[in-house]
C-alpha cells in the first residue's frame, strides 16, 4: 500500500491493492507501479492498464501469460474521507515487457478489462425468448455465465412479444439489442449498457438525466451570489476545462431537429412511417437544463414553414420483425426515432474537465459545471455552465499524483433567470 499526503486535503489518495493472481502464484505490485489508468465510458465496460518496475521478478515467478486476474483497490481522500473506494477485479488481456536501457529492472505493462469481455470469447450461440423484455433478456444472458457473471443493475424495460437473436457472443448480443428497449417511466428509448465504479449497468438516458447532482465543478472565481450553487453539494475546483465541442453540423444531420423512421415487416408485408418532431421530443422526453442546444422559437427566429411541413434531418429504414408488438407504440412514434434523437442530443455539447483525483464520481453521474469566463465582470458562461452527464472518465494514478479526467456531455444550456435549478 502507498498513499499520498498533501497540504491540500483534496489531493490525498491511497492505493491499497494491485494484485496479480496467476494459476499457482500471486504478487502485490502496488508499491512498484509507476503509472496506472482506469477508463470508464457509457459506451462499454471498464478497462485499464498499469506499469511497474519488476524488481522482484513477478513476471517470471508467476509465469504471466496475459490472462491473470487483476485486483485493484484505491481511493481519493485518505482516511475517514474516503467515501467511495474503487475496488474491482479484472482480467488481464495482455502484457508487454520492456528492458531497461541501463541494465536495471525491466518495466512491465499490464492491460486489463472486465472479465465479461474475456468470457465473451468462449460462447457463441443464438438466444430465443418469448413474451419478455430486453431487460429480462440481458439478465438471462448474464446469469448464464454462472459463477463468473458480473455484478449488475438492470433497469426494467417494456415487454414485447417474441425475440430471436442472431448467432453471436453474449456481450455482442447484448450490445445489439439495447437499442430496441424503451421505458414508460420517462418516455426514454435510448438505453446504455455500461460499467461504472460499482457494477455493470443497463439504464435509460432518461433515468441518467433525472439524477440529482452531488458535485459542483467550478472553473473561475466564485461570484458569491449563490446563483449557480444552490443546494447541499460538494464543490470541486477544476484544474483545466476544455470546451471540446459546442455545435456540430454532424449532429444536425443526425437528427438534432427531428427524425423520420420507416419500419418494415417482411412477415406482415407492411411499411410504417413515424416522425419525431423537436418540440414534441423536448416536451415529452426532456433535457438536462433549461434550453435545448441550438433551440429557437418563433419569437426569436420566425419561420414561414409550419413545423409539420419542415424537413426532418435524419431518415432511417429499419426492420421490426421480432419487435412488432411494441416498436411503434411510443407516444412520439417509433422507439428508434426517439432513441436516435436522444443519442444525438447527448453528443450535442461536450467538455473535458480535469479535477484532482476523485473516486466518488463515476460514469453516468450528473455534475453541475460552474464555468466563469475571464472577463472584467467575471460573467458565468450560460453555454458551459449547467448540468452535465459524465460520459467518459479516466483515473490516472502515479506515485505522486492522482488526476481524474471527465468527458462531460449535455443537450442544453441554462437560462440565467432560473440557473442552477435542480429540476
Swiss-Prot record:
Subunit details: Homotrimer. Interacts with gp5 trimer.
Organism for this UniProt entry: Vibrio phage KVP40 (isolate Vibrio parahaemolyticus/Japan/Matsuzaki/1991) (KVP40)
Domain of life of the source: Viruses
Presence of the UniProt keyword Amino-acid biosynthesis in the record: no
GO cellular component: virus tail, baseplate
Function in brief: Baseplate protein that is part of the baseplate hub. Involved in the tail assembly.
Record protein name field: Probable baseplate hub protein gp334
Induction pattern: Expressed in the late phase of the viral replicative cycle.
Annotated localization: Virion
Keyword RNA-binding assigned: no
Amino acid at each position: 500500500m502507498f498513499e499520498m499526503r498533501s497540504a491540500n486535503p483534496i489531493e490525498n489518495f491511497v492505493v491499497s491493492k494491485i494484485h496479480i493472481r496467476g494459476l499457482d502464484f500471486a504478487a502485490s505490485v502496488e508499491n512498484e507501479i509507476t503509472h496506472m489508468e482506469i477508463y470508464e465510458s457509457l459506451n462499454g465496460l471498464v478497462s485499464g492498464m498499469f506499469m511497474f518496475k519488476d524488481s522482484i521478478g513477478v513476471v517470471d515467478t508467476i509465469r504471466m501469460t496475459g490472462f491473470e486476474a487483476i485486483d485493484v483497490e484505491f481511493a481519493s481522500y485518505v482516511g475517514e474521507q474516503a467515501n467511495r473506494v474503487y475496488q474491482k477485479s479484472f482480467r488481464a488481456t495482455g502484457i508487454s515487457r520492456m528492458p531497461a536501457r541501463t541494465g536495471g529492472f525491466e518495466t512491465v505493462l499490464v492491460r486489463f478489462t472486465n472479465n465479461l469481455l474475456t468470457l465473451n470469447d468462449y460462447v457463441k450461440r443464438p438466444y430465443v425468448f418469448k413474451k419478455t423484455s430486453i431487460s429480462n433478456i440481458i439478465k438471462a444472458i448474464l446469469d448464464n455465465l454462472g459463477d463468473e457473471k458480473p455484478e449488475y443493475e438492470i433497469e426494467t424495460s417494456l415487454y414485447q412479444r417474441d425475440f430471436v437473436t442472431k448467432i453471436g457472443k453474449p456481450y455482442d448480443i447484448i450490445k445489439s439489442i439495447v437499442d430496441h428497449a424503451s421505458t414508460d417511466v420517462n418516455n426514454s428509448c435510448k438505453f446504455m449498457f455500461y460499467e461504472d465504479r460499482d457494477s455493470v449497468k443497463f439504464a435509460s438516458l432518461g433515468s441518467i438525466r433525472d439524477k440529482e447532482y452531488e458535485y459542483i465543478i467550478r472553473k473561475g472565481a466564485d461570484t458569491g451570489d449563490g446563483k449557480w450553487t444552490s443546494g447541499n453539494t460538494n464543490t470541486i475546483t477544476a484544474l483545466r476545462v476544455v470546451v471540446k465541442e459546442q455545435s456540430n453540423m454532424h449532429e444536425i444531420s443526425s437528427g438534432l431537429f427531428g427524425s423520420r423512421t420507416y419500419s418494415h415487416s417482411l412477415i406482415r408485408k407492411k411499411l410504417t412511417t413515424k416522425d419525431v418532431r423537436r418540440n414534441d421530443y423536448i416536451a415529452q422526453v426532456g433535457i438536462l437544463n433549461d434550453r435545448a442546444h441550438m433551440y429557437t422559437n418563433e419569437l426569436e427566429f420566425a419561420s414561414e414553414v409550419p413545423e409539420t411541413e419542415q424537413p426532418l434531418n435524419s431518415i432511417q429504414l429499419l426492420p421490426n420483425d421480432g419487435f412488432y408488438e411494441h416498436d411503434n407504440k411510443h407516444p412520439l412514434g417509433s422507439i428508434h426515432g426517439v432513441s436516435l434523437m436522444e443519442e444525438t442530443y447527448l453528443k450535442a455539447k461536450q467538455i473535458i474537465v480535469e479535477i484532482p483525483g476523485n473516486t466518488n464520481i463515476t460514469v453516468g453521474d450528473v455534475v453541475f459545471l460552474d464555468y466563469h469566463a475571464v472577463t472584467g465582470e467575471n460573467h458565468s458562461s450560460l453555454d458551459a455552465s449547467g448540468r452535465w452527464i459524465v460520459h467518459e472518465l479516466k483515473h490516472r494514478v502515479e506515485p505522486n499524483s492522482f488526476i481524474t479526467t471527465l468527458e462531460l456531455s449535455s443537450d442544453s444550456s441554462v437560462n440565467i433567470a432560473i440557473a442552477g435549478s435542480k429540476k
